């Protein structure tokens, strides 16, 4: 059996074999392609009416993909270019929505714990200490999956937002090895009141998902959860901690609360901006109807 190209630790986790296998567990077909020793994973998505499209999460676009897309009757190829140079000679259109956060917050954790604490906003340090004084206990184990899902339901109902189906999280936790995907929980008086999913990938730890019980918001468990994950990431050899999506523009945007929370962990770090998602049209008719449907949805 031919060995697949090794995906560098500098490649985003969304291009890892673990993520590809998880996507297959959710029912999606995936493809692997290589060129000049570089491997990419492609995920096939299906939509009502307009059919299928390819998505390359945080990966490079290969010209050879166009032939594969035509063979598989794909409407368009979506990808997240690293910079403008990478799309300079491609016929692309901006996607109607971004598949991944366009702005992320990543801190350098090669520093000592003392320095990391000193670079936090005073309120963040205070809340970490408060959670410790309140007796919050942090644990990490996939045995807490039901507690995590309970908190996800509570958070979705409270904020009026749509999370992934429960089966999505179960398959993620079951498929991705526990040494890579860690489920952290915060317990208060023997009750799980907050939980996070964190990926340890190469030199980077990535905060994927979090959920809380708002009844216990005053004990500041989410702050201690993040701090424990940062310390564990340091001890495992990670050099960066990726808090995921933020939105630093717009005063009253829906991201303001979570952005303020994340940015509090470093006053010396600036967020990283990406170009967002772009599409290469394979079937103009399918893509035309797709954009019409998207416009109708945005109005409703």
State what each model feature region is.
Residues 1-50, 84, 92-218:
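A conserved beta-strand-loop-helix scaffold within acyl/acetyltransferase catalytic domains
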Residues 67-68, 174, 180-287:
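Aromatic (often tryptophan-rich) hydrophobic motifs at membrane interfaces
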Residues 4-8, 46-48, 90-114, 239-300:
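Active-site/acyl-donor-binding loops of N-acyltransferases
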Residues 75-80, 137-141, 185, 240-242:
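A structural signal for short, well-ordered beta-strand segments and their strand-loop junctions
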Residues 61-103:
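Non-catalytic accessory segments adjacent to catalytic cores
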């Amino acid at each position: 059996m031919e060995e697949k190209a090794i995906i560098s630790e500098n490649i985003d986790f969304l291009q890892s074999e673990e993520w590809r296998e998880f996507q297959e567990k959710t029912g999606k077909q995936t493809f692997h392609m290589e060129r000049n020793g570089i491997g990419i994973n492609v995920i096939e998505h299906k939509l009502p009416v307009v059919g299928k499209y390819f998505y390359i999460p945080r990966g490079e676009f290969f010209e050879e993909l166009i032939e594969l897309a035509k063979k598989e009757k794909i409407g368009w190829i979506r990808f997240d270019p690293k910079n403008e140079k990478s799309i300079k000679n491609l016929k692309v259109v901006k996607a109607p929505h971004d598949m991944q956060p366009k702005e992320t917050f990543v801190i350098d954790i090669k520093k000592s714990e003392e320095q990391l604490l000193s670079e936090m906003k005073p309120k963040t340090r205070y809340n970490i200490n408060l959670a410790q004084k309140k007796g919050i206990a942090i644990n990490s184990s996939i045995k807490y999956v039901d507690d995590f899902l309970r908190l996800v339901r509570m958070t979705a109902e409270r904020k009026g937002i749509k999370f992934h189906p429960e089966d999505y999280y179960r398959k993620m936790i079951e498929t991705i090895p526990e040494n890579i995907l860690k489920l952290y929980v915060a317990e208060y008086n023997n009750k799980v009141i907050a939980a996070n999913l964190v990926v340890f990938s190469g030199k980077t730890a990535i905060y994927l998902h979090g959920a809380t019980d708002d009844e216990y918001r005053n004990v500041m468990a989410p702050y201690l959860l993040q701090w424990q994950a940062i310390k564990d990431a340091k001890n495992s050899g990670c050099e960066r901690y990726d808090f995921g999506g933020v939105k630093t523009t717009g005063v009253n945007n829906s991201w303001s609360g979570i952005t303020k929370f994340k940015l509090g962990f470093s006053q010396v770090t600036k967020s990283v901006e990406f170009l967002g998602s772009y599409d290469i049209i394979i079937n103009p008719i399918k893509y035309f109807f797709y954009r019409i449907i998207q416009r109708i949805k945005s109005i409703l």
